[in-house]
Amino acid sequence: MFGLPQQEVSEEEKRAHQEQTEKTLKQAAYVAAFLWVSPMIWHLVKKQWK
C-alpha cells in the first residue's frame, strides 16, 4: 500500500480499468443529460395539462 514497492500493472488490468472508466463516464453523461432535459420535459407536460 503506502511506501511499499508495487508490482507493474498488467496490460489486461489496464484495459479492464480503462473500460470501466469509459463505462462510468458514459453513464455519468447519460445521467447529466437526463437531469438537464427532465425539467424541460416536466414543464412541457405540466403545460399540456392546464
From Swiss-Prot:
| Alphabetized Pfam families for the sequence | Tom5
Q: Alphabetically, which GO biological process terms does the record hold?
A: mitochondrial outer membrane translocase complex assembly; protein insertion into mitochondrial outer membrane; protein targeting to mitochondrion; protein transmembrane transport
Give the matching PANTHER family: MITOCHONDRIAL IMPORT RECEPTOR SUBUNIT TOM5 (PTHR28188:SF1)
Q: Which gene encodes it?
A: TOM5
Q: Which GO terms describe its cellular component?
A: mitochondrial outer membrane; mitochondrial outer membrane translocase complex; mitochondrion
Report the transmembrane regions from the record.
27-45
Annotated region (Disordered) at 1-20
Give the UniProt family note: Belongs to the Tom5 family.
**What membrane topology is given?**
Single-pass membrane protein
What does this gene product do?
Component of the TOM (translocase of outer membrane) receptor complex responsible for the recognition and translocation of cytosolically synthesized mitochondrial preproteins. TOM5 is involved in insertion of preproteins into the TOM40 translocation pore.
UniProt topological domain (Cytoplasmic) ranges: 1-26
- What are the record keywords, sorted? Membrane, Mitochondrion, Mitochondrion outer membrane, Protein transport, Signal-anchor, Transmembrane, Transmembrane helix, Transport
Q: What is the protein's species of origin?
A: Saccharomyces cerevisiae (strain ATCC 204508 / S288c)
Query: Is the keyword Hydrolase in the record?
Result: no
Subunit field text: Forms part of the TOM (translocase of outer membrane) complex that consists of at least 7 different proteins (TOM5, TOM6, TOM7, TOM20, TOM22, TOM40 and TOM70).
**Main location class:** mitochondrion
Q: What is this protein called?
A: Mitochondrial import receptor subunit TOM5
- Where in or outside the cell? Mitochondrion outer membrane
